[in-house]
Amino acid sequence: MAFVHIRCLCFILLCTITGYSLEIKVNPPQDFEILDPGLLGYLYLQWKPPVVIEKFKGCTLEYELKYRNVDSDSWKTIITRNLIYKDGFDLNKGIEGKIRTHLSEHCTNGSEVQSPWIEASYGISDEGSLETKIQDMKCIYYNWQYLVCSWKPGKTVYSDTNYTMFFWYEGLDHALQCADYLQHDEKNVGCKLSNLDSSDYKDFFICVNGSSKLEPIRSSYTVFQLQNIVKPLPPEFLHISVENSIDIRMKWSTPGGPIPPRCYTYEIVIREDDISWESATDKNDMKLKRRANESEDLCFFVRCKVNIYCADDGIWSEWSEEECWEGYTGPDSKIIFIVPVCLFFIFLLLLLCLIVEKEEPEPTLSLHVDLNKEVCAYEDTLC
């Protein structure tokens, strides 16, 4: 009987606790919206506090914010106590977000209490047909010094169509227009940007729009981080040597410019006679074993890019000039052999000339004899 009473008591307590939890409710935030301040994709997600029940006025409110581009499979999630959150988006696609209120556990006897979700969305107007939008947009940050972006005109545009590029990154007061366009047939097909102060490791936003008297032009948006599209100069001053007839030692200098030496990774192609293979290193030298001791020549060339310690991605530089070490039977060895042989033959020729010259009679001696004969004959005649 006592056991039955205990079970009844537990049931009553459970119902009481559950009933209390069910009575705790919190409202969602108010006026949730996504705002575009004109920064080419850097948007503000903002809201107002919920209407709070009197007994929860001393409680700390937190907000769970989720947002994404509409074609993304995953949401970004933020827990914050602020009433605004800022982030970059791809404006080529729509944006959607949702938010709800969280009550802190000390106000709810340790249970989690959340409000329903409220949602908001944002998208730019699709002015102009998709075929008028630029094609093949490419941007390269050359040697971490200047940015070059290029594009092709839309598939179906009138001859009077021209494009304009704007850019923005955190630190600028407003979006700026390109001041140095690349042109083809007097049309803008690219832009060069220099002196991008404090622009690394933050989102870099670009918009290319166009104008035509005959039709509207669809805008194109791009967002990236500059350090991830760096294309360095190729390595310089290559040198290769062979030690102990076996060890190949290769050295090169890091390219000139602002990129720290620790930020490079290298790809090396080694050629030994007609065989070649690849290797990689984060240093500016490498030591390998020869694959064939009788090889007549060894050559290598190298390229570089920014490594994972300084960027999430990068673009390989052009290949360096090829540098070669030639074996002992190479052209240099032949020259060393030919020169002394030629000198030896020249010496023999000179010696032979001297010997021949000594064996021939002197012409002055025969002339002297003939003169004496003529004098004697002349004297006999006089007598």
From Swiss-Prot:
- Swiss-Prot/TrEMBL domain comment: The WSXWS motif appears to be necessary for proper protein folding and thereby efficient intracellular transport and cell-surface receptor binding. The cytoplasmic domain functions as an inhibitor of IL-4 or IL-13-dependent activation of the Jak-Stat pathway.
Stated name of the protein: Interleukin-13 receptor subunit alpha-2
Q: List the disulfide bonds.
A: 59-107, 139-149, 178-191, 263-310
Q: Would I find Cell membrane among this entry's keywords? A: yes
Loss of this gene results in the following: Il13ra2-deficient mice have greatly reduced levels of IL-13 in the serum but significantly greater tissue levels of IL-13 when compared with wild-type mice. Thus, regulates serum and tissue levels of IL-13.
Q: Which residues form the Fibronectin type-III domain?
A: 28-128, 131-219, 234-332
Q: Name one GO biological process term.
A: interleukin-13-mediated signaling pathway
Molecular function via GO:
cytokine receptor activity
| GO CC, alphabetical | external side of plasma membrane; extracellular region; extracellular space; plasma membrane
Q: Quaternary state and partners of this protein? A: Interacts with IL4RA. Interacts with high affinity to interleukin-13 (IL13), but not to interleukin-4 (IL4).
Q: What does this protein do?
A: Cell surface receptor that plays a role in the regulation of IL-13-mediated responses. Functions as a decoy receptor that inhibits IL-13- and IL-4-mediated signal transduction via the JAK-STAT pathway and thereby modulates immune responses and inflammation. Serves as a functional signaling receptor for IL-13 in an alternative pathway involving AP-1 ultimately leading to the production of TGFB1.
* Gene3D superfamilies according to UniProt: Immunoglobulins (2.60.40.10)
